[in-house]
Amino acid sequence: MQPLRPDMGAKRDEYRDGAPLMFLLREPTKERILHFIESQKALPFSYGRVGASREDKAPSGYVVDRYRVRLGEGPEAYVRAVQALRGWRQFDLGWVKLLPPDAPIQVGATVGVLARHLGFWSLNTARIVYLIEESGNVERFGFGYGTLPGHAERGEERFSVEWNREEDTVHYDVFAFSRPKPPLAWPGYPFARLLQKRFARDSKRAMVEDVARERLYQT
């Protein structure tokens, strides 16, 4: 499976088998991005045990990441956190874009994650696998999405927010398992891990700031 050449002159045939649009010297146009996402919609997931992240489980041989941050207290903070997740605010990082930005949080929705690096851009695709909507002593909302053939890695990631009624605390929680897609991803895997750690840090900060900002608007 060959990556798209970084010459911005690619032909439609290069999308035929869902080959990753991984490395680009310039930011791709909106039309090109949406065309690539569209080409992935009918393709299968690129890994096994689809949906395993819902139960905090991962297939053997995958790297597991989990991070969590407190967003606030009370039902108002939880409502703001749910709204933030529905709006993909965890991807509002400056160097990362979720496309299309108004993608619905529903099973089957296919999205692209465009990231700007030092001197190049990358685009990866994923599809929502499941939704989480739980009530009780701990209210929880979230979703998991999994990688498609147009992704440099294989795996699944779950984003969720929860309100513990007894403790009256609201948290943002992420669980993911991943591995590089051979043979292209292995040489760049250390760099990919650095990006994953950067995303974890920035994603937590984005959610904290968004929930706090909405609170200020309401006071």
At which residue positions do the language-model features occur?
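Hydrophobic ligand-binding cavity/cleft-lining segments
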Residues: 3-5, 11-118
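Hydrophobic-ligand binding "helix-grip"
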Residues: 11, 118-166
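A conserved amphipathic terminal alpha-helix motif
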Residues: 33, 37, 181-219
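Residues that form or immediately flank small-molecule/cofactor binding pockets and catalytic motifs
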Residues: 52, 133, 179
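Hydrophobic residues positioned within well-ordered beta-strands of beta-sheet architectures
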Residues: 65-67, 111-113, 126, 143, ...
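Short, intrinsically disordered, mixed-charge
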Residues: 82-90, 150, 166, 205, ...
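A short hydrophobic beta-strand element
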Residues: 107-108, 139-145, 170-174
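Beta-strand/loop substructures that line and gate deep hydrophobic ligand-binding cavities in soluble
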Residues: 147-194
